[in-house]
Amino acid sequence: YLAGLEQPIDVMIHNAGIHLEIRHETADGLETNFALHYLAPFVITKLLMPKLSRDRTGRIIFVGSEGYRFAMWGLDLDDLQWEGNKYSGLKAYGAGKLAQLLSMHIFAKELAPYGATINTMHPGMVRTETGKDNGKLYKWYKRNFIDSRSAAPEKSAEALYCLGASTAL
């Protein structure tokens, strides 16, 4: 479907997110956090890069997270699937977000000749459904501590709109 798009793309926003306490795999056998936060945006960006506006106005925006810090010891390139290491939802989330952030630098070099911009933005703490399938303790903690201190999704949407539409960038 994506390869068949004919119009140029002005703005591409990668805004999917998930947090899982227990290791899950996609239908293709990939660890879900890594597939969603890194592999999917990477593949979609590579597929659609030729469609990005080449008139120095094309933009790619990754919705990142300070959660990349949960992978503070770096990516275990020998175990991106979390098959050998003990699974940690926070570390898996961090690994996916760190890989996403690092890939942004690769894409920036590829896009430089066209003048397209690429940004990662941390939306802050936002009330979302992320983690809704986790256990009771996580749900309680999210409801009582995270969500009560989090902004409405519309606030993050304003920042995304600015990155996508501002002529100053």
Go through each PLM region and give its residues:
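Charged, amphipathic alpha-helical interaction segments
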Residues: 46, 50, 136, 161-165
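Proteins with a high burden of low-complexity, intrinsically disordered sequence enriched in S/T/G/P/A and R
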Residues: 1-5, 36, 137, 163-169
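A short C-terminal helix-loop "cap" of Rossmann-like NAD(P)-dependent dehydrogenase/epimerase domains
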Residues: 82-84, 136-146
